[in-house]
């Protein structure tokens, strides 16, 4: 059933223009204990045909991307850097030296969002601001990036570990 769902989703995405997609991987886990319930993978060959690629779940590597956002919020809550329901302004963040960071959903505006909305919209800015608060250096326009971030890094890693990121799977 998982493979069928994966195949349908691939077909849907490709019909919507996702032509560069060359594979799709899926792992279904029990959220209470982490047990793996199903694994599926499909690879799209040069002719556009789907081939089994379950092994890709173990052998392929990808940048974690937005999967870290839940763990970032968890670290923020546990370390009292942010509160549940806290609102922040999603806006382009401008740092010393010309570095600018923004969210994809809101590249130029100033939008107030809370933590739930930050997850729904995958707000990079909310996460950057949370990480800066973890480092004890809340965002101000034109600020330099903090240098002493070892403690904040440990706090963030602990939050990420609690949602299963950065841990050995036992597989």
Can you name each region flagged by the protein language model?
Residues 1-12:
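N-terminal leader/targeting segments and the immediately adjacent pre-domain N-terminus
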Residues 11-19:
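Active-site phosphate-binding and catalytic loops of NTP-dependent enzymes
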Residues 65-74:
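Active/ligand-binding-proximal structured segments within catalytic/core domains
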């Amino acid at each position: 059933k998982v493979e069928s769902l994966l195949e349908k989703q691939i077909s849907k995405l490709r019909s919507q223009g996702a032509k560069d997609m060359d594979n799709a991987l899926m792992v279904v886990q029990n959220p209470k204990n982490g047990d793996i319930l199903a694994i599926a993978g499909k690879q799209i060959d040069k002719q556009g045909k789907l081939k089994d690629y379950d092994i890709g779940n173990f052998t392929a590597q990808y940048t974690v991307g937005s999967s870290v956002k839940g763990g970032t919020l968890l670290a923020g809550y546990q370390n009292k850097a942010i509160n549940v329901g806290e609102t922040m302004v999603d806006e382009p963040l401008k740092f010393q030296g010309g570095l600018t960071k923004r969210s994809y959903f809101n590249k130029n505006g100033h939008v107030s969002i809370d933590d739930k909305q930050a997850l729904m919209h995958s707000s990079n800015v909310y996460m950057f601001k949370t990480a800066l608060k973890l480092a004890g250096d809340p965002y101000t326009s034109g600020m330099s990036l903090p240098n002493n971030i070892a403690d904040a890094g440990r706090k963030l890693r602990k939050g990420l570990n609690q949602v299963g990121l950065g841990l050995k799977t036992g597989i």
